């Protein structure tokens, strides 16, 4: 189809001064419209422009056939008085522009979710929105995804890049509709007289070509450009003899009442997208609370996470003070409810791990920084002070080692000391005191000493010197 007439919905232009439409794989579609309207329509149009409004740009050929060139949301406008008329300028954006406004902070911790289900979850907040995918997103499940300081559009493009795929806005309906991967395309064979230019993106090849698990070849960075009055779509395959490629960019201009299209083509491998990363999250720590603990892993709830009602099945490794592959090290897990931090060491949030617990409020036992303690929720405590070490259950039992006073063992229950070898109790420079409120009983085999008001010796022979 070759369009000769242009129709702009919602507005009646006396003359159309300028029309430009730019479309590119991975970017919002943009249209720029400029023309003259009647002065009497200015007030009515001003009221419309202050509301959210969708505009259809339609092309019509000589036979009356029409085709939607773009349905876009008004993203900007101006009204400029001119002699005998008013110039109206409009800037339109594809519906995906709605997804590129607010930055979000949310996590996806359900390891049973597919990437497609994640995208559909994001789409829900936009009402009129949907996605069509091609290339594995509907079958591949996530491990852990973190959207930090990213718009939904940035996050969606980053997800798609994990599969080497681009995101293409749909422009023929109102709403946030888009494709991930190869949009439905058709193949067209251009005439032999078609003129085209050829170029190579050498800079892109030098920075991208040899990297990744599936490196691209130099010829994958070839680009072909043709200008035509025929209307094609992104991802359409245009054959130019033995060359050609897939449409990755379209520039439409309406000049002298004639609509022309400039198409940029790339080989299919050249349509692949390199892995995108969120550099803002690299090296960051995020406050969280522990919800469950198992072995050396924890489940967490991130503070401020927008995705509050999700099913959390992701187990994060917990970092301790020291750990080695053979199992040696420090094993000390946090308790449910403890405040911790999620550490993201690099560009992949799946590599994140949980680190040290954070004490948010000062307790009565945390007043003196010279005191170091290790305490469980059951009250068992190991306390280090500048002049002592104390092990206690805080229920009447303790062992104290004090620099000035020595060692003290206190128990409100039995104390049992046993040995299969020799046992020596001695005092080299002072006294040895054995005291019992009821009795003292010392035994060895059949011999013994019993002190219970009276003193009783038992044995085959008793020698007193």
Positions of PLM-derived features:
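Short beta-strand-centered aromatic/proline hotspots
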Residues: 68-79, 243-253, 288
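Short beta-strand-centered interaction patches in the first periplasmic/extracellular domains
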Residues: 87, 94-96, 135-200, 351-355
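Right-handed beta-helix
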Residues: 122, 157-159, 169, 229-232, ...
């Amino acid at each position: 189809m070759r369009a000769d007439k242009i129709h702009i919905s919602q507005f009646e232009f006396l003359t159309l001064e300028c029309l430009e439409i730019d479309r590119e794989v991975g970017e919002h579609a943009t249209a720029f419209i400029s023309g003259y309207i009647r002065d009497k329509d200015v007030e009515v149009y001003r009221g419309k422009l202050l509301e959210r409004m969708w505009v259809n740009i339609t092309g019509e050929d000589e036979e009356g056939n029409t085709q939607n060139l773009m349905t876009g949301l008004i993203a900007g406008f101006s009204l400029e008085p001119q002699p005998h008329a008013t110039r109206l300028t409009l800037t339109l954006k594809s519906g995906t522009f709605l997804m590129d406004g607010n930055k979000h902070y949310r996590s996806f911790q359900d390891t049973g979710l597919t990437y497609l289900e994640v995208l559909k979850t994001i789409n829900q907040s936009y009402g009129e929105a949907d996605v069509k995918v091609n290339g594995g997103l509907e079958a591949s499940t996530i491990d852990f995804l973190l959207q930090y300081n990213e718009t939904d559009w940035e996050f969606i493009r980053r997800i798609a890049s994990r599969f080497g795929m681009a995101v293409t806005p749909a422009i023929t309906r109102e709403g946030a509709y888009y494709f991930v991967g190869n949009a439905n395309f058709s193949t067209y064979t251009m005439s032999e007289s078609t003129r085209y230019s050829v170029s190579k993106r050498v800079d892109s090849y030098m920075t991208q070509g040899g990297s990744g698990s599936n490196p691209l070849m130099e010829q994958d960075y070839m680009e072909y450009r043709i200008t035509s009055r025929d209307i094609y779509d992104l991802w359409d395959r245009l054959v130019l003899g033995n060359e050609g490629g897939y449409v990755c960019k379209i520039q439409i201009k309406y000049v002298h009442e004639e609509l022309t299209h400039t198409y940029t083509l790339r080989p299919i491998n050249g349509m692949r997208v390199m892995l995108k990363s969120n550099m803002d999250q690299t090296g960051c720590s995020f406050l969280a609370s522990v919800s469950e603990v198992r072995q050396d892993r924890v489940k967490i709830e991130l503070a401020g996470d927008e995705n509050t009602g999700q099913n959390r099945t992701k187990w994060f490794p917990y970092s301790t003070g020291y750990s080695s592959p053979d199992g040696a090290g420090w094993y000390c897990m946090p308790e449910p409810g403890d405040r911790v931090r999620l550490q993201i060491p690099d560009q992949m949030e799946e590599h994140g791990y949980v680190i040290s617990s954070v004490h948010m409020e000062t307790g009565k036992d945390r007043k003196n920084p010279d005191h170091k303690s290790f305490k469980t929720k059951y009250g068992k405590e190991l306390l280090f002070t500048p002049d002592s070490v104390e092990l206690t259950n805080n229920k009447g039992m303790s062992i104290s080692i004090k620099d000035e006073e020595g060692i003290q063992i206190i128990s409100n229950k039995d104390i049992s000391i046993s040995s299969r070898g020799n046992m020596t109790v001695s005092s080299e420079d002072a006294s040895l005191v054995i005291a019992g409120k009821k009795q003292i009983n010392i035994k060895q085999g059949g011999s013994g000493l019993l002190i219970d008001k009276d003193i009783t010796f038992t044995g085959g022979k008793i020698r007193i010197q």
